[in-house]
């Protein structure tokens, strides 16, 4: 709900699927080791050229589910990108 302020963010606009996956994974790991509690991931709302679902949005959803450092995530508030961005809550580093 945006009640926990995000500490770092990443923008995946303009990246290929492979670049976005690698950068998102690296960003989440680095944020976790820096003991961030919440981060912002901007994937955008752009639809692919043939009018199908936004690729980075759906891929980001899948990738975040696979990362062990991620506790939860949800769409951001409008001021932070709305449905084109995600708040990601990270697990606490022990």
Where are each of the predicted segments found?
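Long, charged, low-complexity intrinsically disordered regions
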Residues: 1-38, 42-94
């Amino acid at each position: 709900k945006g009640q926990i302020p995000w500490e770092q963010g990443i923008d995946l606009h303009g990246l290929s699927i492979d670049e976005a996956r690698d950068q998102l994974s690296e960003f989440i790991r680095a944020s976790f080791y820096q003991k961030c509690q919440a981060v912002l991931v901007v994937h955008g709302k752009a639809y692919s050229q043939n009018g199908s679902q936004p690729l980075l949005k759906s891929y980001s959803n899948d990738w975040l589910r696979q990362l062990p450092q991620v506790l939860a995530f949800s769409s951001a508030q409008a001021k932070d990108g709305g449905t084109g961005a995600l708040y990601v809550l990270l697990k606490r580093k022990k």
